[in-house]
Amino acid sequence: MSELIIQFSQWLLTFTQGAEPWDSYARYLPRLMDGVWVTLQLVIVSGIVGFIMAIPLALMRISKSAWLWVFPYCYIFFFRGTPLLVQIFLVYYGLSQFESIRNLGWLWTEVLSQPYWCAIIAFSLNTSAYIAELFRGAIQAVPKGEVEAAQSLGISRRKQYQHIILPRAFGIILPAYGNEVILMLKGSALASTITLLDLMGATRGAIARTYMSLEFFLLAGLLYLLLTAVLIGFFRLLENWYNAHQHALNMSLEKVDPQLRDKHLEDNVR
């Protein structure tokens, strides 16, 4: 243990006083920033596509018809039960094994054979399974009183979902959705395994040329921490803005009668 401390102290002294690490940082920082941009594209595009895919999956999942809920059940079970790395390899290496896929013309040459699009496809499929389960739970957690009020007003089922249930469910899943996006950000490092120059891919390239593994992994870790902090702040602001009416309702009820606020909270729990 003492030898490890001594070696780390020597490395830290060399790192802080030597010029070589800082010169290497300055030389490869533009490539790392390009990798940051690619990582952000992966997370943003996959997060949006996965969110859109999750809505019909969640609606089918809560259906009483076996013909509708069997497919999303199997889909969610597969993508939640297998490693993301395996899913990336299945999309990038697996699709090329089928001649019918290779004969798709520009769809093959421009999309399905490119690591960038294969990574987006794999991440979108993976995150849609998790978000679909979040949506399913949120839809079932919408207070029954709100749905019953809409039914008493004669609002159609489609408009109930469009104007009441889905918007309410989105507010419920926002914190969990933010966590899912952050997990996807950290999982995006696996995209470098299919030759994509995201942040981790650019970091590995810099290490291969400079042999400064610890220094560049530390820098990559700091950049991932910065991206995570930005996402946390963004989703916190989004949650406060989107659910502002809920906080305002609780405050207004408490001013009238504290028992009304307690009753409102009990209805939400139910």
Predicted regions and their residues:
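Transmembrane alpha-helices and adjacent helix-loop boundaries
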Residues: M1-R270
